Curated annotation (Swiss-Prot):
Physiological role: Might be related to the phospholipid scramblase and tubby-like superfamily of membrane tethered transcription factors.
PANTHER family in the record: PROTEIN LURP-ONE-RELATED 12 (PTHR31087:SF106), PTHR31087
Organism (species): Arabidopsis thaliana (Mouse-ear cress)
Name used for this protein in its record: Protein LURP-one-related 12
Family membership noted in the UniProt record: Belongs to the LOR family.
Length: 220
C-alpha cells in the first residue's frame, strides 16, 4: 500500500497531496468509487458515487431532461452540502468549463478549468489548477466508453475511469454504472468534479443493447 508522504511543506500540504476542493477526500490507498447515473432510479439525470460499503460519497442532482442543457452544475456530499460548482464558460470553441469552490457567487474566481485540447473530434482534455502551484493534468481516453486516465505532467496517473465488472458474475455492467478509482493523495472531490465536466463535454453514445444495469452493491 502506498502511503501519503509525511513531510509537510510551508504551505501546509503534505508532500504528494493534491488538494483542490476538500482535503477530507484524500485517501492513503487506492479508493474505488462506484458511480451511477441516477436516471436509473429517479426522474432526471445526475450522478451518485458510492464506496465499497454502499455508502454514498458524492451526488449530482439534475431535474432537467438533459444535463447537457445546463450551464452550471453542483457537486454535493452525501448530506447535500455543496462542495463544488462547475460552470460552462461561454463563448468558447474548446468547450471550456470552470470549477468554483462551494456554491458559486457572482464575481468568484475559479479554482480550476477544463478544456478540450482540440476543437475537432475526440481529443485529450487539459486541466489547469489556479492555486499558485501551476499544476496541470491531462485526461486521456473516451469518457463515453468509460475509459479514461487522468495524469499529471510527470505522467503519473492520479485517477482512472473504467467500466465496472460485477465480481460475482464477471459480467461487465452498462455504461450507466462505472468505476472512478482515485489514487493515493489525490483529491477525490476534484476527481468527481472532472467526471461531471467530462459528462457534459463528451456526453454519451447510445447505450448498447444488452448493457447490464444494476443498483450499486456492497463489495466483499
Amino acid at each position: 500500500m502506498e502511503l501519503v508522504e509525511e513531510t509537510i511543506p510551508k504551505e501546509g500540504k503534505k508532500m504528494g497531496e493534491r488538494i483542490v476542493v476538500d482535503k477530507a477526500y484524500l485517501y492513503q490507498e487506492d479508493k474505488p468509487l462506484t458511480v451511477c447515473k441516477t436516471s436509473l432510479f429517479y426522474t432526471g439525470d445526475g450522478f451518485a458515487a458510492y464506496d465499497c460499503r454502499g455508502d454514498i460519497i458524492f451526488r449530482v442532482d439534475s431535474y432537467g431532461p438533459d444535463t447537457r442543457d445546463n450551464d452550471e452544475i453542483v457537486l454535493m456530499d452525501a448530506t447535500g452540502k455543496c462542495l463544488l460548482t462547475v460552470k460552462r464558460k461561454r463563448p468558447t470553441l474548446h468547450q471550456r468549463w470552470e470549477g468554483f469552490l462551494g456554491e458559486r457567487s457572482e464575481g468568484q474566481k475559479p479554482i480550476f478549468s477544463v478544456r478540450r485540447s482540440s476543437i475537432i473530434g475526440r481529443c485529450t482534455m487539459e486541466v489547469e489548477v489556479y492555486d499558485g502551484t501551476g499544476e496541470e493534468y491531462i485526461i486521456d481516453g473516451d469518457f463515453s466508453q468509460r475509459s479514461c486516465l487522468i495524469y499529471d505532467t510527470k505522467k503519473c496517473t492520479v485517477a482512472e475511469i473504467k467500466r465496472k465488472v460485477d465480481a460475482s458474475t464477471n459480467v461487465m455492467l452498462g455504461r450507466d454504472v462505472f468505476t472512478l478509482e482515485i489514487k493515493p493523495g489525490f483529491d477525490g472531490a476534484f476527481a468527481m468534479g472532472l467526471v461531471v465536466v467530462l459528462d457534459q463535454i463528451n456526453g454519451d453514445d447510445p447505450v448498447e443493447i444488452g448493457d447490464e444495469q444494476v443498483h450499486p452493491f456492497v463489495e466483499d
